[in-house]
Amino acid sequence: MIDPDGFRPNVGIILTNDAGQVLWARRINQDAWQFPQGGINPQETPEDALYRELNEEVGLERHDVQILACTRGWLRYRLPQRLVRTHSQPLCIGQKQKWFLLRLISNEQRVRMDLTGKPEFDGWRWVSYWYPLGQVVTFKREVYRRALKELAPRLLSRD
């Protein structure tokens, strides 16, 4: 499902622990790290997609997390030209994302990245809240900055 402007609707997931750290996941067979994210299917709400992607990518269920906040609007990034599939119709030039800030309320041993036949990640770790800004691929950096900045006050006020 791609919107008329060429952006694919997507959810981004910032999962925090009680220490305020965030889950940082390594793409399978790559030295590339990112937050879990994934597309919103037709007839799915962003929250529905959040829970589906959370389960597919990190093995967590609805009862394992608490939603602390969600970005107010869509945050967009364009794909680098080398990643645009120019022969696909409709043409997808990037992603538009709703970002969710979650708190893990279950034990971290519940995090599993091998529950699907095609896992997206092969490792993870807890990192400081702002660490991802210096590590994520360049074309996603501004969206990460905007999401982290908008959601940070909710992390600090959660107690």
UniProtKB/Swiss-Prot annotation:
Catalytic class of the enzyme: hydrolase
Protein name: RNA pyrophosphohydrolase
One term under GO cellular component: cytoplasm
Physiological role: Accelerates the degradation of transcripts by removing pyrophosphate from the 5'-end of triphosphorylated RNA, leading to a more labile monophosphorylated state that can stimulate subsequent ribonuclease cleavage.
Cofactor or coenzyme needed: a divalent metal cation
One Gene Ontology term of the molecular function aspect: mRNA 5'-diphosphatase activity
Pfam families for this protein: NUDIX
NCBIfam families: PRK00714.1-1, PRK00714.1-4, PRK00714.1-5
Chain positions of motif Nudix box: 38-59
Domain Nudix hydrolase: 6-149
Native source organism of the sequence: Pseudomonas syringae pv. tomato (strain ATCC BAA-871 / DC3000)
EC number in record: 3.6.1.-
